Structures are given as structure tokens and as C-alpha cells.
Amino acid sequence: MRILVTNDDGIQSKGIIVLAELLSEEHEVFVVAPDKERSATGHSITIHVPLWMKKVFISERVVAYSTTGTPADCVKLAYNVIMDKRVDLIVSGVNRGPNMGMDILYSGTVSGAMEGAMMNIPSIAISSANYESPDFEGAARFLIDFLKEFDFSLLDPFTMLNINVPAGEIKGWRFTRQSRRRWNDYFEERVSPFGEKYYWMMGEVIEDDDRDDVDYKAVREGYVSITPIHPFLTNETCLKKLREVYD
């Protein structure tokens, strides 16, 4: 397959290098990734300013470029400029830390894959769910095995897979729902060396979803969480109720 690999941790991150090198053992791999950390940039794109791109070296088997853009920019550039619109699969990752619950709305990793889904290209976001001790190789090897088994024709149009891999021994995988996992944010007030006040965002994770088949519960129990998601955000249940009342 011709595989495009991107991420939001940057071209220099271990996660993308390990993933690209392992995938290139069996596939034609192109890497287009941000030239610096772009975590939590969501699905932003670059407009009104130039996008710069530079060829970089990862390995002999991998064609790689860094860009000044976001993960979504990287996918657009790769598809339209570098790969001549011939892409069989897009993989975004391996991310350092989980992308579960409401994280996916902020995640540049997920947005890189979602950009592919919006083009109706098979796309996967993959994260090592332990931020402190990420197992990039374990996540990458899981993905390689998964690709040999999974039938992408089972996915609806414009749908991607969001995969979170637990650290340590993997018991198997589960197809899961996006959870209601979210953050309670607060801001720590600090003072710069120049005496200027600034704020540092902090947060505590809230995991109180009462459903059993959600992403973080699978990961907590040692299973890889695989969640099919799409870019269409309409709340169909609420829409039906509103129409019944007001139409």
C-alpha cells in the first residue's frame, strides 16, 4: 500500500519515526508532519500565510517532509502535492498519550486522520495511551498486525478509526464508543522573570461514563480501544425531538 503518515507531535518525535520505519518494511511510506509540536491544534488549517515544506531524512525506505503547518495541512499537502492523490491509507501517530472521549475534539492526531476521512480515504489515528511511558513500538506493531486482518470495506463512507493502545501486555482489542471522558480545567497564575503575570492551564481528568463499552474502560482493562468516528456532528436524537415539538 501507499501509506501517508502524519502526527501532531512533530517530525522529530519517536512515535512517528518508529511507525514509519516499521510500516516501510512492507509498504511504500510517505511521511509529512509538522516541523514542531502541534498537539491540541484540533482541525485547524493554515490560511493567509505561506506553508513551507522541507525534505528530511528518516530512513532509506521512507520519503519524508516537514512542514510549517498543522496535521490537517500536512495531509492536504501530501495528498495534493507529494503523492499525486494516490493514497491507500492515512495513519496519524503514534501519539504520545491517549486520545479518548472529548480529547478527540482538540487532538491534532485525530484531526490528521479525520482530514483523510473527509477525503473518503481509509484513515487511522493511533495513540499510545500512557503519556509518561509510551510504548511506540508496541502500538506500531499492533497496527501492522491489525492492518493484515481488518476489512476497511466494513466502514461507512467518511469514517475513520481512532485507536488507543494500552501500555504493557495487550489482551486483545475491542470496538468501542467515544466516551464522555473530559477535563476539569483550571488556570495557575504565575509571574514571569520580568514581573509579568501569565496563566498556565492545568486540568483533572473526569471519567464517569456509566456505559461499559467506551474507550477508556477498554484501555484500563488492557484492551486496545478502536472507535469508528466521523466528521458529522448532528445530534440525531435531539434533532428528531426538536422537529416533533416545533415542526
From Swiss-Prot:
<feature type="binding site">
    <location>
        <position position="8"/>
    </location>
    <ligand>
        <name>a divalent metal cation</name>
    </ligand>
</feature>
<keyword id="KW-0963">Cytoplasm</keyword>
<dbReference type="GO" id="GO:0008253">
    <property type="term" value="F:5'-nucleotidase activity"/>
</dbReference>
<dbReference type="InterPro" id="IPR036523">
    <property type="entry name" value="SurE-like_sf"/>
</dbReference>
<dbReference type="GO" id="GO:0005737">
    <property type="term" value="C:cytoplasm"/>
</dbReference>
<dbReference type="GO" id="GO:0004309">
    <property type="term" value="F:exopolyphosphatase activity"/>
</dbReference>
<comment type="function">
    <text>Nucleotidase that shows phosphatase activity on nucleoside 5'-monophosphates.</text>
</comment>
<dbReference type="Pfam" id="PF01975">
    <property type="entry name" value="SurE"/>
</dbReference>
<feature type="binding site">
    <location>
        <position position="95"/>
    </location>
    <ligand>
        <name>a divalent metal cation</name>
    </ligand>
</feature>
<keyword id="KW-0479">Metal-binding</keyword>
<dbReference type="GO" id="GO:0046872">
    <property type="term" value="F:metal ion binding"/>
</dbReference>
<dbReference type="InterPro" id="IPR002828">
    <property type="entry name" value="SurE-like_Pase/nucleotidase"/>
</dbReference>
<keyword id="KW-0378">Hydrolase</keyword>
<dbReference type="GO" id="GO:0000166">
    <property type="term" value="F:nucleotide binding"/>
</dbReference>
<feature type="binding site">
    <location>
        <position position="39"/>
    </location>
    <ligand>
        <name>a divalent metal cation</name>
    </ligand>
</feature>
<keyword id="KW-0547">Nucleotide-binding</keyword>
<protein>
    <recommendedName>
        <fullName>5'-nucleotidase SurE</fullName>
        <ecNumber>3.1.3.5</ecNumber>
    </recommendedName>
</protein>
<dbReference type="InterPro" id="IPR030048">
    <property type="entry name" value="SurE"/>
</dbReference>
<feature type="binding site">
    <location>
        <position position="9"/>
    </location>
    <ligand>
        <name>a divalent metal cation</name>
    </ligand>
</feature>
<dbReference type="GO" id="GO:0008254">
    <property type="term" value="F:3'-nucleotidase activity"/>
</dbReference>
<comment type="similarity">
    <text>Belongs to the SurE nucleotidase family.</text>
</comment>
